[in-house]
């Protein structure tokens, strides 16, 4: 005879391989707090509905509190033979309070139980991620305000394109992270419905109050269809999707840090706190924190792809395949959390090299567009003609091996005789960034205004969170 808690139907014990492939406690033990919280809400509702006695509910609640304390203190023994977190908790509850523990599972299945637990877990992840991203935005906006006047090269195709400010570059990531936070917040809204009470798949004949348990657990409402309630994992997929986009943003920034800290580029410097050395080359300072962010963010994308593949062929309702929804997701969430904290630390730690940045900003004829704009504004030249004239002037400068502002005026006039010495005023990198005053442009005053606005907004968010 099977000794499993579900073993009444069975006359033989499971094969050892069956037990090995079926066990999930190594992963879902991380749901212990959510499992206990949901069970307490379920027990209270059962008592309120007269399905179990108030005394049984009281004893169940006390027993669950004891189990929570044991797990938190590291004194709880998780048993693989009991398969999962639900059976481990229920078994220990029976040891503590006796037969009343068996009443807890009335009008409930492990199908809706695990769906509830994992929703609560992912909701916690969403809230923690939002707070971590807000801290990253804070760090970025503070550094942007500090570096609003620091000129650096802006790039397209990884080639010097136009001068920008370091503050402007940092503010670009503030905006990216804002979209990330918006996606996580939207995912939370759709997640926040309770599957508890859907039972195995068809609901229950007991007069339960699903609205009461939903409210007790902080959900907006119970899910409207019991089949959907136990078989839905959209909330994990959507969270992992938002996490994957966020991971891409973090990885892009990490890549920039790797490039900028290279001695060949030298735009920024990381302290010893976020670099490591070499076991053979004494001089090395490697940006390993940034490189590891770049690598670990791939785990997030992998978790999304893995769960999509698990879910794509499953008919309604619950299938055992769905037991595989947690490990990859949890690892992905952990990788994202670490990456956010690492990037936040590096943002606070990094120091720009202003002179090198300024020099690099002027390389590659980065103020050529400023020359073309001057021709349009001053000489009323059509932009396409100004583009052509500027290209010829750049060609002359390149042939002579000089910067645009170093090219003699006579050489410029050989291409366009109406050019005057006034053009020199727009060819410095400082004048270039100051002129970019259009909304969203890199002008220092724009950067300061946007950084201050974001810091004010973030301070307000902190008060209301």
Curated annotation (Swiss-Prot):
PROSITE patterns: FUMARATE_LYASES (PS00163)
Enzyme Commission designation: 4.3.2.1
Chief location category: cytoplasm
Protein location: Cytoplasm
Pathway: Amino-acid biosynthesis; L-arginine biosynthesis; L-arginine from L-ornithine and carbamoyl phosphate: step 3/3
Keywords (A to Z) from UniProt: Amino-acid biosynthesis, Arginine biosynthesis, Cytoplasm, Lyase
A Gene Ontology molecular function term of the record: argininosuccinate lyase activity
Catalytic activity as recorded in UniProt: 2-(N(omega)-L-arginino)succinate = fumarate + L-arginine
GO biological process terms, semicolon-separated: arginine biosynthetic process via ornithine; L-arginine biosynthetic process
GO annotations of cellular component type: cytosol
HAMAP family: Arg_succ_lyase
Family: Belongs to the lyase 1 family. Argininosuccinate lyase subfamily.
Protein name in UniProt: Argininosuccinate lyase
């Amino acid at each position: 005879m099977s000794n499993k808690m579900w073993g009444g139907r069975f006359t033989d014990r499971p094969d050892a391989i069956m037990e090995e492939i079926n066990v999930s406690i190594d992963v879902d033990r991380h749901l212990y707090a959510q499992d206990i919280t949901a069970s307490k809400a379920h027990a209270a509702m059962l008592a309120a509905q007269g399905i179990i006695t108030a005394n049984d509910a009281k004893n169940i609640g006390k027993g669950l509190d004891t189990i929570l304390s044991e797990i938190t203190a590291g004194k709880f023994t998780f048993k693989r033979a009991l398969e999962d977190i639900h059976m481990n908790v229920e078994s220990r509850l029976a040891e503590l309070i006796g037969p009343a523990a068996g009443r807890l599972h009335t009008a409930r299945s492990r199908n809706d139980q695990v769906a509830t637990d994992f929703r609560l877990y992912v909701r916690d992840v969403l809230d923690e991620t939002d707070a971590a991203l807000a801290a990253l935005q804070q760090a970025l906006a503070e550094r942007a305000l500090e570096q609003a006047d620091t000129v650096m090269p802006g790039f397209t195709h990884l080639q010097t394109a136009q001068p920008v400010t370091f503050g402007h570059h940092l503010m670009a990531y503030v905006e990216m992270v804002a979209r990330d936070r918006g996606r996580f917040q939207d995912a939370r809204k759709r997640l926040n419905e309770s599957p508890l009470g859907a039972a195995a798949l068809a609901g229950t004949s007991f007069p339960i109050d699903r609205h009461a348990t939903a409210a007790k657990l902080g959900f907006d409402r119970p899910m409207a269809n019991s089949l959907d309630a136990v078989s839905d994992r959209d909330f994990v997929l959507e969270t992992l999707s938002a996490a994957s986009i966020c991971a891409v943003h973090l990885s892009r920034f990490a890549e920039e840090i790797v490039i900028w800290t290279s001695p060949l580029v030298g735009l920024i410097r990381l302290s010893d706190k976020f670099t490591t050395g070499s076991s053979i080359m004494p001089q090395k300072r490697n940006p390993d924190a940034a490189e590891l962010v770049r690598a670990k963010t791939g785990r997030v994308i992998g978790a999304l792809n893995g769960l999509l593949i698990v879910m794509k062929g499953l008919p309604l309702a619950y299938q055992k395949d769905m037991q595989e929804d947690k490990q990859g997701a949890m690892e992905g969430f952990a990788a994202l959390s670490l990456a956010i904290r690492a990037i936040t630390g590096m943002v606070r730690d990094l120091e720009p090299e202003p002179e090198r940045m300024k020099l690099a900003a002027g390389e590659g004829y980065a103020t050529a567009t400023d020359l073309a704009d001057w021709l349009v504004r001053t000489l009323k030249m059509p932009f396409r003609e100004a583009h052509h004239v500027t290209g010829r002037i750049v060609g002359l400068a390149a042939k002579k091996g000089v910067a645009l502002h170093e090219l003699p005026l006579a050489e410029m006039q050989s291409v366009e005789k109406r050019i005057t010495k006034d053009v020199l005023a727009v060819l410095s990198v400082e004048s270039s960034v100051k002129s970019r005053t259009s909304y969203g442009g890199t002008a220092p005053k724009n950067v300061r205004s946007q950084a201050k606005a974001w810091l004010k907004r973030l301070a307000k968010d902190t008060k209301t969170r």
